[in-house]
Amino acid sequence: MSRFIFVTGGVVSSLGKGITSASLATLLEARGLNVTLIKMDPYINVDPGTMSPYQHGEVFVTEDGAETDLDLGHYERFIRTRLNRRNSFTTGRVYQHVLDKERRGEYLGATVQVIPHITDEIKLKIREGAGDADVAIVEIGGTAGDIESLPFLEAARQMRVELGSSQSLLVHLTLVPYIATAGEIKTKPTQHSVKELRSIGLQPDILVCRADDPIPQSAREKIALFTNVEARAVISSPDCKTIYQVPRGMHEQGLDAIVVEKFGLDLPEPDLGEWDRVVEAQLNPEHEVTVGMVGKYIELVDAYKSLNEALIHAGISNRAKVNILYLDAEDIERDGTGVLESLDAILVPGGFGDRGTEGKIAAIRYARENKVPYLGICLGMQLAVIEYARHVAGIEKAHSSELNPNTPDPVVGLITEWITEDGQKELRSADSDLGGTMRLGGQECVLEADSRAAECYGSTHIVERHRHRYEVNNNYLPQLEAAGLKIVGRSADGELVEVIEVGDHPWFVACQFHPEFTSTPRDGHGLFKGYVAAALAEQKAHKET
């Protein structure tokens, strides 16, 4: 039977519940437990798949094709377990399932209400998400006091009663602000946040207090006194140089020891050697490179969260600090490519819509013609094909039917059908719903043995995660390949282009999938490690000339 740890937040949002949950999971996993994590989001959207990155940040895709909150990316980067669609759900998903059951008559004519029907559905999904894990850490989105979060908090309260104190814990994350004019930190917001939880029947077992600097013992004791929490269970969580320091910091304060004790478990101390090596490599780089990321959501770096982390991981593997220069594609479209001249490498990430398209294509052309290492991801591959078609293959009006439905040469077009992993045929048209209708999740890819991609992966057969509706149009492949474009990766059935390379270039690789979703700080990812290594080589060659 699984044990459950509920994680809530108070005072303000964006305190780091996801990092806290992932760090605790890391510590428990290092003690030998099978740990999983669940994220519950209180918005009405069924999933974040159709939400703007400006609203929600990155959409993280799981191996089984679920479009989820970016916190699941944190979870997978911190623990060894791969998550699935049961590890993330929203208010919208819960209500959708309850209403479907009502339509089918499963409630036998009862009046369907928030309590018990919505809360029962939430509890069911929590237990399904836990599966056979020893411990399930359940992060409740939002902030204590939000109306939207109340059904989730009520479900957590009920589960705590059902499970008992030896099978469930509540960790509450709060803010302890420093008031410069007073010259002191203030504990009152934390006290009121806990008071809010207690008013609905939830008493925290552990408080994790976020602050700029370590919280003095006297302040922790004061918080403990007024929140009915043990002083040792008031954990100080100051800002760190890197998020990968958080597990070690929490272990040193005894967070995992408190959890293990309260659950009545006898477990060995965690071995955090891998994490110490990650932190040491990240904070003590021997080299430094600058990567230009040409995108359209650069005002919000969380829109590229997994990508940012994957570059950091590749830097760790190469003992290099990777500086990311975020470049607005529309600026390049308007002002030209001069801003690219100081870069060691260029990257065009995924995205949707035509805004900034020509700026991205200009950046890709600059990378190709000036032999600058280039990595294209999803749309970044499609635009690389369009750029090559226009300027090398002589298809001057080449475009994507997504970005220009009237193009006479759609070298990138809508995928109208494909075969899923379970052998089912998926059919799509331009009129299909936007939500949940893409080619999603892990898909097999076969690489050419002599390709750079195969060299990076160390294999010719890989599985990577996808999130797209459009693909390279196979009708144009003969013309593109005749002009020198190398198709080095295809889907398992050979029908879809997955990876391209440019032969007469030191490192020009673009892929239809999202390799950033499977990169981790302890292992990195072959494609990103190869990319950063190429950037270092480019930098060295540039200095020598």
Curated annotation (Swiss-Prot):
GO terms for cellular component: cytosol. Keywords: ATP-binding, Glutamine amidotransferase, Ligase, Magnesium, Metal-binding, Nucleotide-binding, Pyrimidine biosynthesis. GO terms for biological process: 'de novo' CTP biosynthetic process; pyrimidine nucleobase biosynthetic process. GO terms for molecular function: ATP binding; CTP synthase activity; glutaminase activity; identical protein binding; metal ion binding. Mg(2+) binds at residues 71, 139. The keyword DNA repair does not apply. The keyword Magnesium applies. ATP binds at residues 14-19, 71. Residues 290-541 form the Glutamine amidotransferase type-1 domain. Allosterically activated by GTP, when glutamine is the substrate; GTP has no effect on the reaction when ammonia is the substrate. The allosteric effector GTP functions by stabilizing the protein conformation that binds the tetrahedral intermediate(s) formed during glutamine hydrolysis. Inhibited by the product CTP, via allosteric rather than competitive inhibition. Its EC number is 6.3.4.2. CTP binds at residues 13, 146-148, 186-191, 222. Residues 1-265 are annotated as: Amidoligase domain. L-glutamine binds at residues 54, 351, 379-382, 402, 469. The active site is at residues 378, 514, 516. UTP binds at residues 13, 186-191, 222. Pfam families: CTP_synth_N, GATase. Pathway: Pyrimidine metabolism; CTP biosynthesis via de novo pathway; CTP from UDP: step 2/2. It catalyses: UTP + L-glutamine + ATP + H2O = CTP + L-glutamate + ADP + phosphate + 2 H(+); L-glutamine + H2O = L-glutamate + NH4(+); UTP + NH4(+) + ATP = CTP + ADP + phosphate + 2 H(+). Catalyzes the ATP-dependent amination of UTP to CTP with either L-glutamine or ammonia as the source of nitrogen. Regulates intracellular CTP levels through interactions with the four ribonucleotide triphosphates. Belongs to the CTP synthase family. CTPSs have evolved a hybrid strategy for distinguishing between UTP and CTP. The overlapping regions of the product feedback inhibitory and substrate sites recognize a common feature in both compounds, the triphosphate moiety. To differentiate isosteric substrate and product pyrimidine rings, an additional pocket far from the expected kinase/ligase catalytic site, specifically recognizes the cytosine and ribose portions of the product inhibitor. Homotetramer. This is CTP synthase. It comes from Alcanivorax borkumensis (strain ATCC 700651 / DSM 11573 / NCIMB 13689 / SK2).
